Amino acid sequence: MAEDRFPGWHGTTILAVRRGGEVVVAGDGQVSLGQTVIKGTARKVRRLSPGGHEVVAGFAGSTADAFTLLERLEKKLEAAPGQLARACVQLAKDWRMDKYLRNLEAMLIVTDGETLLVLTGAGDVLEPEHDVTAIGSGGNFALAAARGLMATDLPAEEIARKAMAIAADICVYTNGNLTVERISK
């Protein structure tokens, strides 16, 4: 899925898989400008610990915009420790109402090991119906592969790695250099 909302810059696949009491978030390392790979080892999945409560976040879109959103999410989490959904809804409200934030071009997947949410560029907070979600240029490929692999007995991390490998084989804006973070509640 090409992201027309982010013209010029392409190249992110972030996938989250929840299974067996843990959530695994995986992201590829490729950043492209047009038809050129600018970097192959970008780290788009981060572990945050605001107020001592661990959260894992993966981002797609503009890196600077994503970092701005991550910083604001950390502040919301400090104000509502251990309440990921509440912090994300508060961030989404700001995102929709603030003139500056409305122009940010990024999406986030966030989890505390129990709650799994997607924050869209439109300021929406979505909880996936299934225990899998994905964003970015290869997100649909990774999502389809992971949903198929959920029918197996594979653990979450293996599902994430296999699905990301499939996405990297299909999407030219996704590579196999993965950052993988696991978190459980």
Curated annotation (Swiss-Prot):
It is an enzyme of class 3 (hydrolase). Its main location: cytoplasm. It catalyses: ATP-dependent cleavage of peptide bonds with broad specificity. GO terms for biological process: proteolysis involved in protein catabolic process. It comes from the Bacteria. Allosterically activated by HslU binding. CDD domains: protease_HslV (cd01913). GO terms for cellular component: HslUV protease complex; proteasome core complex. Na(+) binds at residues 168, 171, 174. Its EC number is 3.4.25.2. It is found in: Cytoplasm. InterPro entries: ATP-dep_Prtase_HsIV_su, Ntn_hydrolases_N, Proteasome_sua/b, Proteasome_suB-type. The active site is at 12. Keywords: Allosteric enzyme, Cytoplasm, Hydrolase, Metal-binding, Protease, Sodium, Threonine protease. One of its GO terms (molecular function) is metal ion binding. Belongs to the peptidase T1B family. HslV subfamily. Protease subunit of a proteasome-like degradation complex believed to be a general protein degrading machinery. A double ring-shaped homohexamer of HslV is capped on each side by a ring-shaped HslU homohexamer. The assembly of the HslU/HslV complex is dependent on binding of ATP. This is ATP-dependent protease subunit HslV. It comes from Cereibacter sphaeroides (strain ATCC 17029 / ATH 2.4.9) (Rhodobacter sphaeroides).
